[in-house]
Amino acid sequence: MLTYNMDVTPESVWKRTTPSEAELAQPYYCTEAGVFYAQQHFSTARTDKESYILFYTLRGAGLIEQGESHVVLSTGQALLLNCRTPQSYCTAPGQDHWHHYWVHLDGAGVAAMEPLLLPGKKLTPVQLTGVKMQEYFEMLLGQMEHSTVDSMVTTGLALHEMLALC
C-alpha cells in the first residue's frame, strides 16, 4: 500500500529508471531519485517496497516514522531507511517546508552496510558537514538519464560514497 500527498513546488524533480540485469548485479543501484521542495502538507506512507531510501535534508525538516522509531531529519542530516518495513515520512510538524534529496537504492552492498547504518534497525540520522552529499545527489540525478557502462559505474560509486558519508 502506498499513500501520499505530493505537496511540492514545481521545481521539484522526480526521476525513475528500470535497472538493467547488469545494474541489478552491482552492489549499489538506484530505481528512483529526486529533490523535493516539499511544502507543509507533503507526506508519504507505504507498507513495503523492495529497496532502501536515503534522505538528505537541505532546508527545513522532515519527520520519519518506522515502527516505534520517530526522528526529525533536520538541515544537513542524512538517514537510511529500509523500505521493506512499513514507514511514513512528511514535512515535520511546525515546519512549512522540507527541501530534501532522496534516492531509492538497493543491492548487496547496501544490505551488507545496513547493520552499520541502522544499528539495531533503529532510525539513526547522521549530521553531515560540507556539500559532498549534495554533489553526489546531483551527479546521481544527471547519470539517471544515461544507460551506459560509465553511468552504471558512476552511479554505483556515487551511492557507495553517499553511504560512506553516513
Whereabouts are the PLM-identified features?
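Generic protein-terminus/edge-of-domain signal
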Residues: 1-72, 77, 88, 121-124
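N-terminal helical cap/lid subdomain that shapes the substrate entry/recognition surface
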Residues: 117-122, 139
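Ligand-binding loop in jelly-roll beta-barrel domains
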Residues: 70, 84-109
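Short, charged, solvent-exposed linker or helix-capping segments at domain edges/interfaces
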Residues: 44-45, 112-118
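An amphipathic alpha-helical interaction segment
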Residues: 106-112, 127-166
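A general structural signal marking secondary-structure boundaries and capping sites
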Residues: 37-40, 61, 83, 144-148, ...
